[in-house]
Amino acid sequence: MDLKAKPVLVTGATGYVGGRLVPQLLNAGYRVRALGRSVAKLKGRPWGGHPQVELAQGDVLDYDSMAQATQGCSAAFYLVHSMLADPGTFSETDRQGAENMVKAGQDAGLDRIIYLGE
């Protein structure tokens, strides 16, 4: 299994971990599909204009956007946690996003999903 043959998806690419992972993946020879809720924020990253980076807008809470984002990828890094969620709904919101990632990844035939736990 050659994970470099297709792009890898990085969710939460505008966040602390995602923003630092993208350049590491590029240095290792991967093509990256960087997912964020705002393409403008993705473009503003130092790697936003890199020729091996595809910018994608989406939200892990929206299954359709996750299904589209995972298509054609070999693997996905799930680096999103619901920091903006109401404290009373944090767990539910976080669970829904993770479930969407897993289902979209299975439907797209991803070889791996790498999950950043708490």
Question: What are the language-model segments listed below?
Answer:
Residues 35-40, 59-60:
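N-terminal Rossmann-fold cofactor-binding loop
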Residues 80, 114-118:
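Active-site beta-alpha turn of Rossmann-fold NAD(P)-dependent dehydrogenases/reductases
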Residues 12-18, 58, 72, 97, ...:
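Glycine-centered flexibility sites
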Residues 29-31, 52, 110:
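A generic structural signal for alpha->beta connector loops
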Residues 7, 74-75, 112:
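Structural motif
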Residues 2-30:
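N-terminal Rossmann NAD(P)H-binding glycine-rich loop of SDR-like oxidoreductase domains
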Residues 44-108:
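NAD(P)H-binding glycine-rich loop region in Rossmannoid oxidoreductase-like domains
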